[in-house]
Each structure stands twice: as C-alpha cells, then as structure tokens.
Design a protein with these regions (language model features):
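Long, low-complexity regulatory segments enriched in Ser/Thr/Pro/Gly and acidic residues
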Residues: 2-6, 10-18, 26-32, 43-93, ...
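Generic amphipathic alpha-helical segments used as scaffolds and interaction surfaces in large
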Residues: 21-28, 117, 121-124, 163-171
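Alpha/propeptide regions of enzymes that mature by internal proteolysis
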Residues: 38-41
C-alpha cells in the first residue's frame, strides 16, 4: 500500500485522455476559464442588459437575464470556471441579488491579475493585494451604508422591487414587493429575520397578481364538487 494511502490521503486515478498543466500555463487556463464565465453574463447587466435564451438537451427553453439562473443552466466542467459560478451562488444565498455584478467584478479582477502576472508580479503578491483591497472596499461600504428601519416601509418596498427587476416576476413586482415586505415583517423578531419561517407555495391556475400572504397554515385540499 502506498504511503499516501496509509496517511489517509485520497488517491485519484485519472483517465488516459487527462492532461496535466502547471505553472504559467495552468494560471493562463484558469484565468481564461473564469473570464469566459464572466463574459457569458456581462451583456445581461444594467438597464440595457439583454435576455439570454437557453435551451437544454431536453429542448426546454429558458429566457432570462438573471445571472445565477443562466450559470445554473450552463454545463460547466472546468474547476476554475466553477469557482466563478460559486461566487454567484454565494451572492444569491447571502444577499438575494447582485449575482451578475459579482461575477462581472470577479472577471475584471482576473483580467487585471492576468496583466500583472504578465509583468512578472508573483501571484502571492497579487492575492495579498486583493485581500487588502477587499478590506478597504468593505471599510468604504460600511462608511457609506445607510441604516434602514423596519418602519421605513417605502424603502423596504423599493429594495424588494429592485431585487425582482430582470427576473420572471418583474411584471408583478409592485404587487409582490408589498407581499414580500409584509411576509418579512411578520416573521421578524429581536434577533432578525429567519426566512425559513416563510414558505412559498405554488397553486396551479390564476395569475401571479393573485398571490396573497397567509399568516397561518395552508392545507392543500381539492375542491369538493
């Protein structure tokens, strides 16, 4: 038995067609893969952003300009590219919006890093610089952040409405924004908001404008004829 197996380290067997890259070639391939992912959603960003039509192997069609939706529908195998996808997923889970912006910024950082590497700046130095820049950016954001009171309903509705822009629910965002704010305030306590206490149930029939907030329990029963 090999020493690596004795130490509990996994042994990975690669296929015959596998290729191994290292050094500058590996850096270039990883950066290129990450930039390609960012480029795929770049044109969906902003007020003039365009929708993407995605067709899967089964023929299903999805039309959206939502970054995380687009990236989830794409078949991505490259490890570095998948790290960029994880950026969008983390942004979606933590904030619920800004996924495309996060991916585009990551792509720009990779682009700048590539230029600096070409100038023989060591990747470790770049990583340290990016960490310092992230701390400074966080500091500036905290200085410019505005506290929003739970009683400031107008601002809360605007925030919810903005988060739906460019998504499937955009046509009904005025109605849904009010519902969302009501739902969040209903489960708010001194420790914050536990979104697990909010359940979204879909019912066949009707329009999205028929959505309503039920502060209680829903029992799915067929109508008696």
């Amino acid at each position: 038995m090999s020493q690596r197996m004795q130490q509990g380290q996994p042994m990975i067997i690669l296929g015959e067609d596998s290729q191994r890259t290292q050094g500058k070639d590996a850096q270039t391939m990883n950066i290129t893969a990450g930039k390609a992912v960012a480029e795929s959603v770049r044109t969906t960003l902003g007020p003039k952003g365009m929708d993407k039509m995605l067709v899967d192997s089964g023929g299903s069609v999805v039309v959206t300009n939502d970054g995380v939706t687009i990236l989830k529908e794409m078949d991505i195998d490259h490890p570095a590219a998948n790290m960029i996808v994880e950026v969008s997923e983390t942004q979606e889970d933590e904030v619920g919006d800004g996924t495309t912006t996060a991916v585009v910024i990551a792509g720009e950082l990779l682009d700048e890093a590539e230029e600096l590497i070409d100038q023989d700046i060591h990747p470790t130095t770049l990583a340290q610089g990016y960490r310092s820049a992230a701390e400074k950016a966080k500091e500036i954001l905290e200085q410019n952040a505005i506290d929003v009171s739970p009683d400031d309903r107008e601002t809360l509705v605007k925030i919810a409405s903005t988060a739906m822009t460019g998504k499937g629910a955009e046509n009904a965002k005025d109605t849904l924004a009010d519902l969302l704010v009501d739902a969040v305030l209903a489960v708010r306590d001194d420790e914050g908001v536990d979104t697990d206490n909010i359940s979204v149930e879909k019912v066949v029939g009707g329009a999205i404008d028929n959505s309503e907030l039920i502060e209680g329990v829903i029992v799915d029963k067929e109508r008696v004829s």
